[in-house]
A protein has these predicted regions:
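Hydrophobic alpha-helical and helix-loop surface patches within well-folded domains
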Residues: 2-169
Length: 169
């Protein structure tokens, strides 16, 4: 759908290479071949999330993957982490799925951890451990020590409310 041919040309190879690398890393690390018959990428201009996985397909907000010419190294790293996160959900979230969204933390924790590991080789100049700590811990501690803290396991009666279970912890 991207109408800017230069933008498409500038991003296309990186998007496919990052997905291929994430898939290969997950197969090597888990010892489990990619579990679905296809792997589709769908870029949606006005999607409310950066990305959302489904068995065999990932939906992305178009702007999350199609970077401008002025994109920084941090922008490219954020794109790589998003791709790695959503790709890892093919194993942790789709192949292995919690019984119900009460335990949504399980798939998100694994996907976040795997994303950090997957992106490390592509960005050797980044201190990934420090970045993971600096990005994750302050947000989690801010929520966890205050009155807005949620239990790890959160009962969910209505699937329409599932979005309320996602947060910094």
């Amino acid at each position: 759908r991207e109408a800017d041919a230069a933008k498409l040309a500038r991003n296309r190879d990186a998007i496919f290479d990052l997905h291929a690398g994430a898939l290969a890393w997950m197969e090597r690390s888990t010892g489990i071949p990619y579990p679905f018959g296809k792997f589709d990428l769908v870029l949606i201009p006005a999607f409310q999330f950066g990305g959302m996985e489904h068995p065999g397909a990932v939906l992305y907000k178009e702007a999350s993957l199609m970077l401008d010419a002025s994109a920084t190294e941090a922008d490219r790293l954020a794109r790589a982490e998003l791709i790695a996160h959503e790709t890892s959900h093919m194993w942790f979230g789709d192949l292995v799925t919690m019984r119900w969204f009460d335990d949504v933390w399980m798939k998100e924790v694994f996907a976040g951890f795997m994303a950090a590991k997957i992106t490390e080789p592509a960005f050797p100049g980044v201190d990934h451990r420090l970045r993971f700590l600096a990005d994750t811990y302050p947000r989690a501690y801010r929520v966890d020590r205050g009155p807005g803290a949620n239990a790890i396991r959160q009962p969910l009666a209505d699937l329409d409310e599932a979005g309320s279970l996602y947060g910094p912890i």
